[in-house]
Amino acid sequence: MIVVKNLIKIYKIYQKTGRLITDIFFRKYEEVLALDKVSFEIGKNELVAFIGPNGAGKTTTLKILSGILFPTAGYVSVLGFFPFEKKEAFLKQISFIMGQRNQLIPDLTAMDTFLLNKEIYEIDDYQFKKNLQKLTAIFSAEKIIHQPVKMLSLGERMKMEFIAALLHQPRIVFLDEPTIGLDIFSQEAIREFIKDYQKEFKATIILTSHYLEDVKRLAKRLIIINKGKILYDGSLTAILQRFSQIKYVSLILEKKVKQEALFKIGKPIVYQLPKVIFQVEKKELPRIVAYINNKIPYLDLVIEDEKIEEVIKSLFKNQR
Amino acid sequence: MFKKIKRNLKILLLLTYNSLKITSQSRQGMIFFTLGKILRFLLLFGIIFLVFSKTKIIAGWSLKQVIILYLTFNFIDTFSQVLYREVYRFRPLVVSGNLDLILVKPYHPFLRLLLGGVDLFDLLLLLPYLFLLLLFIFQENVSFFSFLLYLVLVVNGLIIATAFHIGVLGFGLLTTEIDNVIMIYRDLLNLGRFPIEIYQQVISLIFTFIIPIGVMITFPVKALFGFLSFKNIVFSFFISFFLLWLSVKLWQIGLKRYQSAGG
């Protein structure tokens, strides 16, 4: 469905020197490598999350996949089309929702934009009514579609943006920071909506977000990108197996234990008796568990993975 | 093909209807805007009469010919403003990044960026201009062929205006500083209210061959009175289609180099 091979994007950024004559007649441009030989494939009905720090290349990738930007080099095919050609048959099958951009007309009602999109995407009356009913029902937004957009709250406006973008039932949906700036209730509503939409319409969804909660709740596959390079492409669970070298061992002691016996496990990161937590190397885990079973009397033993946020953070740190 | 035209017309009608709904929200603004335009039109009309009270001919043009030229200018200027009002709102779209969401829509972006804000109130102003224009033309002794050529050259003038506006959009993709470009276009076009012969020869040549305001406005009126040579008629069509081609190329280059806000 989506094939990207050795994709490169270079931005030319105008460098201001502050000297008037130089800035007018002898402009200097800096070349910024936004994407550096990025390759991946995405299949039908997948929900893939792109994550990375600001300027990592997430949005640039999405903009190239949707045909907004022209790639500097590399191969891009989406639904069999080269996106930049902006063929109608291609554009009718995709949709792009950006958390900080609007397609709704602020002075009019959301319904006015929906009706305009009905003509643009050539949706017949029956299908339009059916889709609108379904989408507004998911959001419980039947009433606000008739209010002027400028009178809506950010969360309500975002819901309307989603409906406007999905009325034509796109096969591929690009979501760029869809929950940015929203309160926790609206974030939750949007997440539920994305999940329901993917299930109902069998769409392929590509999501970028700074909120790991979005990723954890929605995506099975994760693409981590930094400085224009893909650092990881795989499942959420596999990332822990591959990159996490740490486990957390949490103990509730049955009775007082000599400190020396406990410190043989390692220096605890939490020492609030009867609770003790250790951070241990993954490879040391079997030896440590055996030692605890033999030497330490306990009421409860819990072994936990490192948090995904920590794994990703250390991945970015290592790349710096 | 017919289906596509029908669909585009439907979208255009909806965009126009939405634009009308937005404009009608500010009634006072609408009234003052229209009054200002009428006042400007009447003042210039007064100046023409004042000049001709002191002299009978300006650069070989009689009073009625200058009035027809002035009304032709107003018709072309107002008509292009009616159609291409949305171009004046292009910069905010680029700067905010909302242009991205227009580029992913399955229609030609000109439908929205060029024609998406048709101003129906300006269209109303066009009717008295048209009435006065025809009134003055039919008072003159012009042949049917000259009138037909005049109409064709007015359409040709509108093609040049279209090319200018597409060019502004193309510039807008390359640099966001397009407000200046559109103001330069407006200022230059304003010089076309009078026959280009009143300017010095160098300026007159510039207005014919480089910035063809003369071709847009003076040439149709010259053709109406039989002053325009065959060579200049051919040149008029050549320059309009060349400018249209050039502006579309500029737009395409702009799209390729477009970096998108926050990209």
Could you describe each region identified by the protein language model?
Chain A
Residues 20-23, 115, 119, 126-144:
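Conserved ABC ATPase "signature" region
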Residues 74-85, 89-91:
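Conserved ABC transporter NBD signature motif
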Residues 107, 148-155:
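Conserved ABC ATPase signature
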Residues 173-177:
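Catalytic Walker B motif of ABC-type/P-loop ATPase nucleotide-binding domains
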Residues 191-279:
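ABC transporter nucleotide-binding domain
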Residues 248-315, 320:
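Short, charged/small-residue-rich alpha-helical element at the C-terminal edge
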